[in-house]
Amino acid sequence: MQTLTSVYFYSSAGLVMLVFVAAVAHKLRQPNEFIRALVGYRLVPDVGLRFWWVLPLLELAAVLELLVSTGESRWLALSLLLLYAAAIAINLLRGRRDMDCGCGGETTPIGWGLVMRNIVLALLALPQHAPIDELMGLGVALTLVTFLLGTLGYAIVNQLCANSVRE
């Protein structure tokens, strides 16, 4: 059972790190696109838009947090994911569906699927106790397979969210 806990601990951290690394890369490569998305949410005052770089910096800090985490210090990643879910939900409740989420990658309109995706990612980022055992042999293989399946599942959900409004 301890091996399964280790598999979950490391693969969930790896998946959330991958999501944040992709988001940071997109925001830093295309800052104007990200700023446009921030403006679209109508949650940040104009003066706050000058500090757009704080979000990618916090996401990078969340990656580092997950990388060196003993499990109890995953609060930044969890908080950012819940913040993003709340920002999307607020705009959906306002009736605003025709805007880019600013998540990274190709343009993805906001929708309830993105809210659920971020909540699931937040659940994966929940602080937990680090496993004590060392991953060996089968445990490492299971972790890699779980991480790859999680990454594939994330990519599928992301594509479904991106396509949901286009139809």
PLM regions and their residue ranges:
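Membrane-interfacial helix-loop segments of redox and metal-homeostasis proteins
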Residues: M1-R166
